[in-house]
Amino acid sequence: WSAELYLAGAKESDIRDALRERQIRVEEVDWQKIHLLGDLGSEKLTDYYNLCDVFCMPSYFEAYGLVFAEALTYGLPCIGRDKFAMSEFIEDGCTGRLISGEDAEELALDLWEVLQDPKYREEVERRREWYLREYSWDKVAQRICSVMEKNERDKDQYRSACLLYTSPSPRD
């Protein structure tokens, strides 16, 4: 099995530091198959989404996970952790895989499965129009604005409730 790894958003020095932390000797890494892309503009990012067969980001923290929605709109099955918002976008065993721990072997097996089994790509392709409609930047921006407007409308109600709850009542 031969694969190439494209790392976007990471600086080479950060990758080398991470390898050293894990006691992997930098000189043992096949740098011919690892491409450190750094920060990409949207046009370049589109090129790489179109080049890849799977999107993998088993992040320790991903508050919203919009990057998974973005990858799905390009027809890419996704691999992420079963934490935070990743499970909102990835349906385990259907549109990708959710990994539970930090086991590199588990990650490698899931990558192999997603790359070898066409059902993942077929399912993402089947849902692609829905992803494009529901996760367009306009639609996401509308949702975020809606939540912010609701919070703004409701803030006085919550502040009053909080004040009522925390204010001591006179007993004399």
Placement of each model-derived feature along the sequence:
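Nucleotide-activated donor-binding/catalytic signature segment of Leloir-type glycosyltransferases, i.e.
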Residues: G9, A18-L40
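Short alpha-helical donor nucleotide-sugar binding micro-motif in glycosyltransferases
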Residues: D39-L40, D47-C52
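Aromatic "clamp/platform" in nucleotide-sugar-dependent glycosyltransferases that forms part
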Residues: Y60
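Short hydrophobic beta-strand element within catalytic cores of glycosyltransferases
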Residues: P77-G80
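Conserved acidic donor-binding segment of nucleotide-sugar-dependent glycosyltransferases
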Residues: D92-G93, R97-A104, E113-P118
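A short, well-ordered alpha-helix in the C-terminal region of glycosyltransferases
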Residues: K119-E134
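Conserved small/polar residues in nucleotide/adenosyl-binding loops
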Residues: Y165-D172
